[in-house]
Amino acid sequence: MADVKKIATRESYGNTLKELAAEGHDDLVVLDADLAAATKTGMFRKVHPDRHFDCGIAEGNMMGVAAGLSTMGYVPFVSSFAMFAAGRAFEQVRNSIGYPHLNVKIGATHGGISVGEDGASHQCCEDFALMRSIPGMTVICPADDVEARAAVRAAYAMEGPVYLRFGRLAVPVFHDADNYHFEIGKGEQITEGNDIAIIATGLMVNEARIAAEQLAAEGIHARVINIHTIKPLDEEIILKAAKECGKVITAEEHNVIGGLCEAVCAVLSEKLPTPVRRVGVQDVFGCSGPAWDLLAKYGLDAATICKTAHEMLNK
């Protein structure tokens, strides 16, 4: 594939918050936990310091503050690393935001193994599982800059709690901003193919694209499906792919337990039993190292997707 621009989706998050405010959305407020430089909400703070609230390293309290602001008519985007937003503050997210179904948007950056050198303590590979278990919570993991920007806008426009996962790592931008339509709960078919389906989310979507190109050179035609919304899940696109391809690979930068794979398997087991193989973090903790090296170490790459496809097709 030709070289393309790379942007971290956390940058997309910060830029879009700033753009929304500039467009006159005066109900938009942003909260952070002493991490505005890392989550990129500092972009918003520079132009609207009166609408940016730094709650310090007290993520649970920050979720409560966001809940309170939402009851007063504001639309809070509450920001921290995924490990702290989904992990440390889970009780407050569940009880203060999820239970009353408040209009709070959680912008969780630094998700997954690709946090890199920060190591296992900061590499949150359990956030999908935690957040999708909360009734009424929408869970989104965009694949690139274009999709991330669209996801932030869609989250702002909808009513109800939303969890958005963004990455630290700069990843290829493969969507065309002028010809891209984002809809919460609707997956996107990226490539044609009926030999095998690769259902991916987040940065694994581009790895699936690369894998599909490599497989095509061997005469294997893989259908790549981008599931940016993990909840609510687009069952229709999954069932169609499973029916027409007969074999499915899921790919996610998350523990294979509790995330996209289990969501897909739940649909297929009930409605269309289909062979499925899981590409993801295999129920282990991460370690410290350069992001791309870690993705390769844990099998979160195109090479592993291709290997898995060969194993399924040759079985």
PLM segments and residue spans:
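Thiamine diphosphate
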Residues: 1-165, 170, 181, ...
